[in-house]
């Protein structure tokens, strides 16, 4: 059973774009959350779906691609090809932003901010 996110989901859009299969997937079921996909895969033998690495737990098995495991090290090195970066964007440079935006960027780059990112299971900005 092939499971996916609903049309319009950013996760679905990125997955289909990375694999160049936009509008070609026939899902047996479309779910409205990453947690829903994870839970359905975990409870349905023979199913497959896609989720973000940060939500993978011991209820499912993350698949290797071309023998490469989906680990932080492999993603950062570029050897695990099914990944996408996120960026934070502003209009202009950080120095041109208001104090709240400057504080946010400072926090993300601080040890405390990095600890939060790591605790969430996300990969630190490089």
What are the functions of these language-model segments?
Residues 1-126:
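Exported/periplasmic ABC-transporter solute-binding proteins
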